[in-house]
Amino acid sequence: MKEYRTITQVAGPLVFVEKTEPVGYQELVNLVLADGSEKRGQVLDTSDDIVVVQVFETTTGIGKDTGVRFTGETIKMPVGKDMLGRILSGAGKPKDGGPDIVPEKRLEITGAAINPWARGSPRQFIQTGISTIDLTNTLVRGQKLPIFSGSGLPHNEIALQIARQAKVPGSDEQFAVVFAAMGITKEEENQFMAEFERTGALEHAVVFLNLADDPAVERIITPRLALTTAEYLAFELDYHVLVILTDMTNYCEALRQIGAAREEVPGRRGYPGYMYTDLASLYERAGIIKGKKGSVTQLSILTMPGDDITHPIPDLSGYITEGQIVVNRDLHRKGIYPPINVLPSLSRLMNLGIGKGFTREDHKKVSDQLYAGYAEGVDLRGLVAIVGKDALSERDRGFLEFAEMFENRFVRQGKDEDRTIDESLDLGWDLLKDIPEEQLVRIDRELIQKYHPKYRKKAE
């Protein structure tokens, strides 16, 4: 392998090398320092006379006397069934004290977009055990659904709870979770590792942890390693895989950092103009392929800077993905966990995975009625602030009380509370029983007579 000493400039995580031979985009590079140690990098850009290399570690010690070796290969992820139960670094190295992974295959981490013609329609309900997701914003197998959160909100706890509890009820098919955390603190890393080991969820999971003090370049690689692992488990070993990515905001900040080092012309709020395309290359790797038994479902968590849902990161994510789950600061202040606000939340594929044969025949109608009742109660809170509660009619006071009950009984649940979909539906009916039947306008009469607590007691 030829070694060149043609480095002209080092800027942040980037090394600029005078071109001496044809090199490929994303080709791996070994950098040999004066003391004989090696660092690894990847070709980020190439022109007629200059190659830009992004280094996976710090660039400390790299100078004009550093040797550069182009390997002719791209980054490949060693994959195998033995990965289940392992905790890896953001670069795919063992972090749990275990041995290196014995690969059954080595796959390129860039993956390939699923051919639209080959995509199957998402149909199967995934139970997370969280009522506000399962009943009102259902996650469907093969869907990509982001969780919009904010700084200081318990999105990590929600992510861990979903990773522990997610399952396809009534199915004996193989299910796995791939969990990738980007830009987390050492404290969060310890929390994630301890929680996975405490609950036994690690048995059917592969965990990737990238720390805040790890290089920004590694943060770009981490979700691609996770998705490559998920695709292997899903499409070659027939697993149904749930991929949880947190925090995509840290990923986008790494994109911005590298773009600034390359002196690119910035887009909105300093983020690269290609951020939409880059995010799509990750999100679109979720799905189902016709003729394959497995599936890849994505839950990506991002913190909205300043709780601004119009910020480029949540804004662009919303265009690519199929809905959003919104974590709310007001609910968090009330001490409600998980503080998920169902009103701005949406699952665009919900109707494909609910109803008779999937969950229960009353699922859609109960969800609509709960949503309508809660929305009316929240609107009335604004009116009460102006005219006072005494000015409300008896009907309005009923909906005001319903909104309080909805938050405190339906939204609120324990961090280890795993509700089945039947339990969530029965709880929904229990809340609706206090609303006069003539006001349950979104539920068919036959469903009321079958599932309403008043009629169920008579039947018993």
Curated annotation (Swiss-Prot):
<keyword id="KW-0406">Ion transport</keyword>
<dbReference type="InterPro" id="IPR000194">
    <property type="entry name" value="ATPase_F1/V1/A1_a/bsu_nucl-bd"/>
</dbReference>
<keyword id="KW-0375">Hydrogen ion transport</keyword>
<dbReference type="InterPro" id="IPR055190">
    <property type="entry name" value="ATP-synt_VA_C"/>
</dbReference>
<dbReference type="InterPro" id="IPR036121">
    <property type="entry name" value="ATPase_F1/V1/A1_a/bsu_N_sf"/>
</dbReference>
<comment type="similarity">
    <text>Belongs to the ATPase alpha/beta chains family.</text>
</comment>
<dbReference type="GO" id="GO:0005886">
    <property type="term" value="C:plasma membrane"/>
</dbReference>
<keyword id="KW-0813">Transport</keyword>
<dbReference type="GO" id="GO:0046933">
    <property type="term" value="F:proton-transporting ATP synthase activity, rotational mechanism"/>
</dbReference>
<dbReference type="InterPro" id="IPR027417">
    <property type="entry name" value="P-loop_NTPase"/>
</dbReference>
<dbReference type="GO" id="GO:0005524">
    <property type="term" value="F:ATP binding"/>
</dbReference>
<dbReference type="Pfam" id="PF02874">
    <property type="entry name" value="ATP-synt_ab_N"/>
</dbReference>
<dbReference type="InterPro" id="IPR022879">
    <property type="entry name" value="V-ATPase_su_B/beta"/>
</dbReference>
<comment type="function">
    <text>Component of the A-type ATP synthase that produces ATP from ADP in the presence of a proton gradient across the membrane. The B chain is a regulatory subunit.</text>
</comment>
<dbReference type="Pfam" id="PF00006">
    <property type="entry name" value="ATP-synt_ab"/>
</dbReference>
<dbReference type="InterPro" id="IPR004100">
    <property type="entry name" value="ATPase_F1/V1/A1_a/bsu_N"/>
</dbReference>
<keyword id="KW-0472">Membrane</keyword>
<dbReference type="GO" id="GO:0042777">
    <property type="term" value="P:proton motive force-driven plasma membrane ATP synthesis"/>
</dbReference>
<dbReference type="Pfam" id="PF22919">
    <property type="entry name" value="ATP-synt_VA_C"/>
</dbReference>
<keyword id="KW-1003">Cell membrane</keyword>
<keyword id="KW-0066">ATP synthesis</keyword>
<comment type="subunit">
    <text>Has multiple subunits with at least A(3), B(3), C, D, E, F, H, I and proteolipid K(x).</text>
</comment>
<protein>
    <recommendedName>
        <fullName>A-type ATP synthase subunit B 1</fullName>
    </recommendedName>
</protein>
<dbReference type="InterPro" id="IPR020003">
    <property type="entry name" value="ATPase_a/bsu_AS"/>
</dbReference>
